[in-house]
From Swiss-Prot:
EC number: 3.4.24.-
Lineage top rank: taxon: Eukaryota
Class of this enzyme: hydrolase
Chain segments annotated as transmembrane: none
Signal peptide span: 1-19
GO cellular component: extracellular region
InterPro entries cross-referenced by the UniProt entry: MetalloPept_cat_dom_sf, Peptidase_M43
Stated name of the protein: Extracellular metalloprotease ARB_05317
Keywords: Disulfide bond, Glycoprotein, Hydrolase, Metal-binding, Metalloprotease, Protease, Secreted, Signal, Virulence, Zinc
Amino acids binding Zn(2+): H185, H189
Catalytic site: E186
Amino acid sequence: MRFSVLLTGLAAAGSIATAERTCGAVPPRAYEKEFTEALNSLSPEAASADLTAGITIDTYLHVLTSGQTGNIPDSQLQAQINAMNQHYSQAGVQFKLVKATRTDNANWASGRDEAGMKKALHMGTYSSLNIYFIPNLSSGLLGICYFPRANPSQTTIIMDGCMVRSGTVPGGETTNYNQGKTATHEVGHFLGLYHVFSENGSCVDADMVADTPAQSKKTSGCPSSQDSCPGGGVDSIHNYMDYSYDVCMNQFTPGQANRIAQSWRAFRAGH
């Protein structure tokens, strides 16, 4: 999933003036069919066991720099892990930092040669999370992450994980998006979550989760309230899978936690 910022005015290198996030990609066409088939192969007890016991994910953080541009100190990397652990505690997920790497490569730090970068840096298995912090993702993107797939090839495993704009870590320079919640949002896709809003402006169950009301549009900024589909409940403006400012985001629902557990068991656990 691609997560981007529409720019207002000129942005200095390493500093972004932001208006709103926009998304430039959708889940794989066959994803929901794969998800349903994988779930049907599980016993209900298998997924519920993950909810009860919790999920711990081995996590590798990769910092890409061009000279000093994009460097993230260890303290901010730990702050990012701490933030994700806090955000996902309500969903029964925790992240264990196994290793952090730093690579000075101007090409990779500009978001180019994704395949070459991941082939060189990817660590762990399909159940491991790799996050690549990149200072200059193309077209103002804040993040890109891949949904889990059934029977992943070796190429799919290597290309897995998330690319996140460096300035979105806690204390970063990306205005309105510097509390570490871009990584939280992107990791939601890694764990099988869709956006809470419809991608085509309709009032449908866009995210396949019963306790997130239908929402026909993404949230911009941090409104006091928003109800784009009257009658079904107000929009999930505080949900990590919307597009609100970081300060507005503070919630996963029980239904999302259940989908994460199901997705984990179906696609990633033991792989």
